[in-house]
């Protein structure tokens, strides 16, 4: 594909990432690193600054064949058509294969259920996966069946028009009824498995929240993501002094109310259909573990 720069001083990777229905920033950087992008006929670097009229050419390689073991497992499919499906992921299920999880992930289950009917844009380890939620977060996850749907859904994520709403129980009683956390998130400087709020190298991250109900020592809140950084809600809530109940990574180290992992549920997902643009709104009821915690909190009042 050939493009021509229309803005002076823009980074090469940012230029590629802002093209309609195009690549994510990380995918653009990977293409550049692999030598698949040229600027005026010369291999580009991700931090190259463009001049107006620069010719940018890039090639997206064909998806590698998936070499993952299909695994039969129950899948709670709450929406499906020819282009995509939406899964209600249970707590404890890893999304894609990684160390220690070679054949028991959502991707393994999707390959068993759908076979070749998954997009290949995210590579062989994440076929069809448009966005991710943590292992111990339950709720809705969009899966693309073809590359066109994947590209269009990813574009909505990038321009913040895919609405994702989460239910959470946080530690402490929130004084305000609603608020916004606008704080950049980046990799933790000493613990590479964690994220943190940081001005140095952090990426823009915005979380809107509102109180659903207050309890003794805890608050049930609803969060809406404006961006989608790794661990965003968990990091932002801990940053303002109200870590997610059960989150022993960013919050209190000892389990509370029988929860040893976060009480966080992706309850609503709204987007434009990639084929014709009509609105799709999908909802998932609170899972049993979440309702059990609310019952305990009711009895504590």
Enumerate the predicted regions with their spans:
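Pseudouridine synthases involved in rRNA/tRNA modification
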Residues: 1-27, 75, 190, 200-206, ...
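RNA pseudouridine synthases
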Residues: 1-180, 184-189, 283-296
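Thr-Gly-centered strand-to-loop micro-motif
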Residues: 39-40, 96-97, 144, 195-199, ...
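Short alpha-helix capping/helix-loop boundary micro-motifs
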Residues: 40-45, 217-220, 255
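Short beta-strand micro-motifs in enzyme catalytic cores
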Residues: 85, 166, 219-221, 267
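Short flexible coil/turn linkers enriched for glycine and charged/polar residues
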Residues: 81, 135-136, 162, 203, ...
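Short, surface-exposed secondary-structure edge patches
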Residues: 45-49, 222, 261
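Residue-level recognition of well-ordered beta-strand positions that form the cores
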Residues: 59, 169, 184, 210, ...
């Amino acid at each position: 594909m050939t493009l021509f720069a229309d803005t002076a001083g823009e980074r090469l990777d940012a230029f590629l990432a802002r093209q309609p229905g195009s690549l994510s920033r990380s995918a653009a950087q990977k293409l550049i690193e692999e030598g698949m992008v040229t600027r005026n006929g010369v291999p580009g670097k991700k931090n190259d600054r463009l001049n107006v009229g620069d010719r940018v050419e890039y090639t997206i390689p064909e998806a590698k064949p998936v070499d993952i073991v299909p695994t039969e497992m129950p899948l709670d499919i709450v929406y499906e058509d020819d282009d995509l499906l939406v899964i209600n992921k249970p707590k404890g299920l890893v999304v894609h294969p990684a160390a220690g999880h070679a054949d028991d992930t959502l991707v393994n289950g999707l390959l068993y259920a759908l076979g070749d009917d998954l997009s290949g844009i995210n590579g062989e380890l994440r076929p069809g996966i448009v966005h991710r939620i943590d292992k111990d977060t339950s709720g809705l996850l969009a899966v693309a069946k073809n590359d066109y749907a994947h590209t269009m859904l990813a574009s909505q994520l990038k321009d913040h028009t895919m609405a994702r709403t989460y239910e959470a129980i946080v530690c402490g009683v929130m004084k305000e009824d609603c608020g916004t956390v606008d704080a950049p998130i980046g990799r933790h400087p000493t613990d590479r498995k964690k994220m943190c709020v940081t001005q140095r190298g952090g990426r823009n991250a915005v979380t809107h929240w509102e109180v659903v109900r207050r309890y003794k020592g805890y608050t049930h809140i609803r969060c809406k993501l404006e961006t989608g950084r790794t661990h965003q809600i968990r990091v932002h809530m801990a940053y303002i002094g109200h870590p997610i109940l059960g989150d022993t990574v960013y919050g209190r180290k000892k389990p509370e109310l029988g929860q040893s992992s976060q009480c966080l549920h992706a309850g609503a997902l709204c987007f434009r259909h990639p084929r014709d643009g009509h609105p799709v709104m999908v909802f998932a009821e609170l899972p049993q573990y979440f309702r059990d915690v609310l019952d305990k909190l009711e009895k504590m009042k």
